[in-house]
Amino acid sequence: MDRIKAKINELKQKLDQWNYEYYVLDDPSVPDHVYDQAMRELIELENAYPQFKTNNSPSVRVGGFVSEKFNKVKHKRPMLSLSNAFDANDLRKFDQDNQNASVDLKGYVVEPKIDGLSISIIYKNAKLHQAITRGDGVNGEDVTSNILTIKDIPHYIDQKYKDYEIEVRGEVYMAFHDFYEMNDNLEESDKKFANPRNAAAGTLRSLDNSIVAERKLSAFMYYLVNAQELGIKTHYESIQFLKDNKFKVSDLIVKVDTIDEVINQIDRYTKVRNDLSYMIDGIVIKINNLEVYDEIGYTSKFPKWAIAYKFPANVVSSQLLEIINDVGRTGKISYVAKIKPILLDGSIVEYATLHNFDFIKEKDIRINDEIKIYKAGDVIPYVDGVDLSKRLANSVPYESITNCPSCQSVLVRENDEVDQRCLNIYGCKKINIEKIVYFVSRNCMNIEGMSDAIINKFYDANLIKNVADLYYLQKHKEFILASDFKIKDKSFSNLINSINNSKTRSLEFLLTAFGIRHVGPNLAKKLAKQFKTMTTLMHANFGELTNVDACGEKAALSLINWFNDDHNVSLVNQLQQVGVNMEYIDDFIYDDNINIIDEYKNKTFVITGSFSISRDEIKTILEKYYHAKVKNSVSKKTDYVLAGIEAGTKLEKAKLLGVKIIENEFWKKDNNF
């Protein structure tokens, strides 16, 4: 059982990290099918071992996060994600479930699944009032000013609807030709976008709407949320409403009568997908009859009346010209295939990841082989295997490198890991540069203007050798402006301002920026919330660390080893001396208008289920405003159980014991949420 629980926790940590990369960083590190496979494995394990299923599992949450850059807005109706189908059997099961729930589906509507960023647009008095990203499904980001720059989205709808509040949902995307043009026009020091989806998401989240307008985003609308209020009875009729009101709607949308016709549409979409001017990664199937949606129902994560069929990854073949070796910030050695340029998913591909030498050996990949590749979410595609029928007669197996490609140190494998590593972590130039690149990145200290190219130039000029040196760049101003760095006075001032702003970031960002092995952004946030200060964390023992949710033995040992290293202790002290914040800053803002209900004061609470805010935040409200005690288990001494979505066994026990239950909706109403 311990092994099963550990596997479930491992999958949850991976999926949480991948969700963060996809929704917050707009920079996924794994392809969709790897994510989907992990999610399916998690769901299967949780179904088989329900005692290990928690309410904060990725399997019951809508993917996504709310950015700190924009105002947070609560959706009037949750923006749920869709369950996935991967073959005809999944679609037939979806159909059978629908037939069992309702006899009047009125067929299905089949739509392209646009690979972009979901958006909800609200019209009041027939005028565009507000635009909100999906976010975490409950709360999104207000991006109204940016949406107003997109030509596909009308600012007004027909005046006959001025007495209605109309909510329309769709997908913001970037067409291939606009994506290529934008990447070509980026400054040399700017990071290129990996793909149109990343470009669309990153652009829509820009704080400068002139940049949004310049980059030419597009949008398809596909859902009229309050169609029934307008007397519309079918989803296909609501699509016509969108067309009539000048919204851009895909001309690939069709209505069919049976699930067999839906399955036939897969072939149709597969044939046209590579000829489209935009990226699609599947099709969406919705029941046509709007009047049965509530009858068929919802889970906490997705509607049961719709499903997404995901295309398998596109696989193409190209010749392997060379294997390139590199070293990353942790000393890990990477193997990258340089291939004959080939078109894949709308972009020219010249490189593909080979992971490590064991992967090359297992697949028996050789120079000049014809290799199969597929596009992942990242810039570099993945290698799927070798076409042995095209192997040259004189080919020889590839030999592993034994020395670091940067500093020539002898490579080692630690604890039987598959990865080779350079252990010269303080003397290797490439490792030091990659540490700085990671430190300044968006999900770390977010120092804008410090591009990879500038970091390399500053390193070669001995201006920065470690991350602490960044905070002394101001004193080198005259030298930098006079040198051949192509940095002007205004750019330098902006860079220094960004460096100074980074000093005020909360502890979890600094902890992430250190790049400690096994400590990603999610765990860093939990550690910061638990220990509050860098000093307390530095002195935490193994038991205290592993008591933190999601901090396993590997992460705990890695933290202890990192803080026991004199180089790292010195670095922390240097950063503290220049004024970098070393404390956790709570980003939860309490509402001064919370109603204080006297009957809740000084009582004992148990919290179960999911809410629009975290349980820690609810616990803080109860303790701060009600002086309540919050316990983990229900007993006869429990006064109230606060029950959210998908409440579990604690709710059942409360009912058996006769404990008072506060439902989520009543809690929100009582507290002005």
Swiss-Prot record:
Binding locations of Zn(2+): C404, C407, C422, C428
GO biological process: DNA repair; DNA replication
MF GO annotations: DNA ligase (NAD+) activity; metal ion binding
Listed cofactors: Mg(2+); Mn(2+)
Keyword Plastid annotated: no
A Pfam family assignment: BRCT
Keywords from the named record: DNA damage, DNA repair, DNA replication, Ligase, Magnesium, Manganese, Metal-binding, NAD, Zinc
Source organism superkingdom: Bacteria
Positions annotated as active site in the UniProt record: K113 (n6-amp-lysine intermediate)
EC number: 6.5.1.2
Catalytic activity: NAD(+) + (deoxyribonucleotide)n-3'-hydroxyl + 5'-phospho-(deoxyribonucleotide)m = (deoxyribonucleotide)n+m + AMP + beta-nicotinamide D-nucleotide
UniProt cross-references to SMART domains, sorted A to Z: LIGANc
Function recorded in the entry: DNA ligase that catalyzes the formation of phosphodiester linkages between 5'-phosphoryl and 3'-hydroxyl groups in double-stranded DNA using NAD as a coenzyme and as the energy source for the reaction. It is essential for DNA replication and repair of damaged DNA.
Protein name: DNA ligase
Organism: Ureaplasma urealyticum serovar 10 (strain ATCC 33699 / Western)
Taxonomic lineage of the native organism: Bacteria, Bacillati, Mycoplasmatota, Mycoplasmoidales, Mycoplasmoidaceae
